[in-house]
Every structure is written in structure tokens, then in C-alpha cells.
Design a protein with these regions (language model features):
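Non-heme Fe(II)/2-oxoglutarate
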Residues: 1-95
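A structural signal for short, well-ordered beta-strand segments
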Residues: 109-111, 134-136, 208-212
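Catalytic core of non-heme Fe(II) oxygenases with the double-stranded beta-helix
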Residues: 112-185
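Short, solvent-exposed loop/turn segments at secondary-structure junctions
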Residues: 22, 141, 154, 192-194, ...
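Catalytic core of Fe(II)/2-oxoglutarate
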Residues: 167-219
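Active-site region of the double-stranded beta-helix
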Residues: 75-107, 115-131, 138-145
Length: 219
């Protein structure tokens, strides 16, 4: 049919940028390392208790180290957190949201490192009560875990058909795997389901994860 028009409705976006400059900032990296080291130290009792229960030395296999969730308060990350905050607000405005009576604030930001002995991963999830979420990759390679985004329309899962070519992004695709490198930034709406594939523990895998919420200025 020659006059058939395609009208895109309810689009889903992931926003990507390459920002290696932060990895060249000694203060930024020192902050990342300090928070990571503390998270690893804090997990030692958990690892010991797990090994005692299982009666087997398995180290940190399958674990994921999380720092405290107020990383955005570290002054060494001030430029980074402001960039994320402003960019997130711009994204919501460009999507058509009226934010005159709202300000965007972090609910959490933490640095996360997958187990050195492999098995680190994250199951599919969303970040409820938030509006923009994202990742900034500090350490990764083509051998490490990858972020995977899933179609948020759960209803279509019942009637999905085979996909012609999984290597091509198309409306039929039910999930998309992203290839990232150190310095990659990904931003997306917090309702978008996402996960991280199982990491084999070959190379270090570490990233900053954050969530922001639009809060009313007045009630």
C-alpha cells in the first residue's frame, strides 16, 4: 500500500555519550577507588559467613560490591553529578514533560564492582519511584558483563513472533545488548527494565549507577 504511513507511538530511548575525561581526573578516580575499597572491605564478613555455611572456599564468586548510596555527595564527583543532573532534566523536558514546578534530585548513586572470581550479575529490574537512571562505566572490556535492556511492554511477550535478525535493532526486538567501554555513559527512563549479563571474572568490571527523581517544588 503506497499511502501507508508509519506513526511512532510510545517510543523508548537510551541515551549514550562517551565521557573518558572523568577517568583522567585523579580526584574522580581516587574517590571511585576509595568507595570501592570500602565496599569490598565491608563485604568480608559476608564472604566469610557464606563460606562457613557452605563449608567451601568460594571467595566472592557471584557477588557484587556496592558502595554506600550517597556517592553524589562526594565533592570530588561534583562536576560529574551536576552534569548528570542537568542532562537528566534536559532529557525529561525534551520528552515533553513540564518541569517548571519540579526539581531533579538524586535518590541514590553508588559505585558497583562485580566479583573478581566471576559470576557477578544483575537480574532484570526497574527503579520504581524514580524518573531517570543511568550507568557510567569505570572499568570494563569486551570480555566483561554487558547491560541489557528489555521491551517494557510486558503484554507483547504472550504473542511475540520469531525475529529475522537479532543483530539488527528493529521494532520486533524484545531486548537489546549494549557494548560499552570505559567512559561510556548511558541514561534512560527508570521504568525501562534492564539487567547485567553474568560476568566471567576475566577483566575488572566496575560502574557508577544512579537514580534521579523529579520532586515538586510546592505542594
Amino acid at each position: 500500500m503506497s499511502d501507508l504511513k508509519t506513526i511512532s507511538l510510545f517510543d523508548t530511548f537510551v541515551y549514550q555519550a562517551e565521557l573518558p575525561k572523568y577517568l583522567e581526573d585523579k580526584n574522580f578516580i581516587n574517590a571511585c577507588n576509595e568507595h570501592t575499597d570500602k565496599a569490598i572491605a565491608d563485604a568480608e564478613p559476608t564472604i566469610a559467613a557464606r563460606e562457613k555455611k557452605l563449608e567451601k572456599s568460594i571467595g566472592d564468586h557471584g557477588m557484587s560490591y556496592h558502595s554506600q548510596a550517597e556517592l553524589y555527595k562526594d565533592e570530588r564527583l561534583a562536576d560529574f553529578e551536576l552534569l548528570i543532573r542537568n542532562t537528566s532534566r534536559n532529557i525529561l523536558q525534551e520528552q515533553g514533560f513540564e518541569l517548571t514546578n519540579y526539581f531533579l534530585d538524586y535518590t541514590e548513586m553508588w559505585i558497583q564492582k562485580f566479583a573478581t572470581q566471576g559470576g557477578g550479575h544483575q537480574d532484570t529490574h526497574v527503579h520504581w519511584d524514580n524518573h531517570i537512571s543511568g550507568f557510567y562505566f569505570v572499568e570494563c572490556s569486551d570480555k566483561t558483563s554487558k547491560p541489557i535492556f528489555h521491551d517494557p511492554r510486558q503484554g507483547r511477550m504472550m504473542l511475540n513472533l520469531p525475529i529475522k535478525d537479532h543483530s539488527k535493532l528493529c521494532p520486533a526486538m524484545e531486548r537489546q545488548i549494549f557494548t560499552v567501554k570505559p567512559g561510556t555513559l548511558l541514561l534512560f527512563n527508570s521504568w525501562l527494565p534492564h539487567q547485567f549479563s553474568v560476568d566471567n571474572g576475566i577483566d575488572p568490571f566496575r560502574f557508577i549507577h544512579f537514580n534521579l527523581q523529579a520532586k515538586k517544588l510546592t505542594i
